[in-house]
Amino acid sequence: MLKTLPPTLREKKRYVAFEIISESEFPQKEVVGIIRSAVLIYCGIHGCSKVNPWLIDYRHPSGILRVSREYLDLLRSSLMLFDEYKRNPINIRIIGVSNSVKHIREKFLHVSHEPYYKVIQKLKKRNLVK
């Protein structure tokens, strides 16, 4: 059985609050495609694997991304330069960056973190989340 990595050897992550400004609404699966294509166009496949963008939460028009700390600037520049998706104009604005999801939700998205915390606690009681 594999041992887990100690915290000092794990990849450092940052959480990015973003907002999509567009005429149309996008479902969560399409937002994943938008973020991936923005990073792929600007950074390429190797850069996308290094940035490692992961969509944590999305409720139109804002969401939360998890990215690698070292490549945060690449993500910022690729999202700023992305201006068109499926021939529709689109603008992705970064609201803020933090090292915790709780801080992102409360400070930048103005959403209480407590409902999410209660769901996680219920799942832990059922032994579904470690």
Swiss-Prot record:
Q: Is tRNA processing tagged as a keyword?
A: yes
- Mind listing the UniProt keywords for this protein, alphabetically? Cytoplasm, Endonuclease, Hydrolase, Nuclease, tRNA processing
Lineage: superkingdom:
Archaea
**A single cellular component GO annotation:** cytoplasm
| A GO biological-process term | tRNA 5'-leader removal
Q: Which Pfam families match?
A: RNase_P_Rpp14 (PF01900)
Localisation? Cytoplasm
- The record's disulfide annotation reads none
Q: Which GO terms describe its molecular function?
A: ribonuclease P activity
Transmembrane helix among the record's keywords?
A: no
Q: Which InterPro entries does the entry mention?
A: Pop5/Rpp14/Rnp2-like, Rnp2-like_sf, Rnp2_archaea
Give its E.C. classification number.
Answer: 3.1.26.5
Q: Catalysed reaction(s)?
A: Endonucleolytic cleavage of RNA, removing 5'-extranucleotides from tRNA precursor
As recorded in UniProt, coiled-coil segments are none
User: Which PANTHER family does UniProt cross-reference here?
Assistant: RIBONUCLEASE P PROTEIN SUBUNIT P14, RIBONUCLEASE P_MRP PROTEIN SUBUNIT POP5
Function description: Part of ribonuclease P, a protein complex that generates mature tRNA molecules by cleaving their 5'-ends.
Family stated for the protein in its record: Belongs to the eukaryotic/archaeal RNase P protein component 2 family.
Q: How does it assemble?
A: Consists of a catalytic RNA component and at least 4-5 protein subunits.
| Protein name per the record | Ribonuclease P protein component 2
According to its UniProt entry, this protein's organism is Methanococcus vannielii (strain ATCC 35089 / DSM 1224 / JCM 13029 / OCM 148 / SB)
Taxonomic placement: Archaea, Methanobacteriati, Methanobacteriota, Methanomada group, Methanococci
Q: Which gene encodes it?
A: rnp2
